[in-house]
Amino acid sequence: MTQPLFRGAATALVTPLRDGKVDVDALRRLVEQQLENGVAALVSCGTTGEPSTLSLEERELVIRETVKAVNGRVPVICGTGANCTQAVIDNERRFRDLGCAAQLVVTPYYNKTSQEGLYAHFMAIAEHTELPIILYNVPSRTTLEILPDTLRRLIPSGRFIALKEASANLSLVLEKLDAIDGRLTLYSGNDDLTYPLLAMGAQGVISVVSNVLPGEMAALCQAYFDGDA
């Protein structure tokens, strides 16, 4: 079984703004609040951080300041996803030296490509980037589902380390777990499905609600791991 990058609750950070600009002081306070409450990792400029509405310069600033504030205490994961393959590659090249442990890559949105197109998209990213890749499946937002057979084809490249799964179709999640066969770490991508996915073998959650309830989400995961949930 693959060694997880983190175990427990990670927070997909919001991006604090004031007067139309990134509020760096508020971001630093948010990071410190998260760490004081036991989160296991942070995601900077994932989709919760609204990167599609930020400039590249703003995204780089947010990621850099997050890494700086964390100062090595937990892994930081940067969001590089886009609906353009080359844009993802360019984003990773821009962010790769900022100190992140991995990149989170959401499936392309709006384009509604085929599974073959999805495979080609992710394999191009795998070939032309350096940071380890966490796949992000969120069909309610993107209309695309990474199917089990596509996972089977992607995994042998060795570039993919985890799947953030935000599908409510638990039967399909079970099929994906069979396809993964311990070669990727599974994380819940839906707060309300954290407990069911932990019971199915997930190693934690990449959470939105932990922006305001970090201690509670960290405690939920730890209680499950300790057999107290």
Where are these regions (language model features)?
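Catalytic alpha/beta core domains of metabolic enzymes, predominantly
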Residues: 127-128, 139-229
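Active-site beta->alpha loop and helix N-cap motifs at the rims of alpha/beta catalytic domains
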Residues: 2-11, 15-145
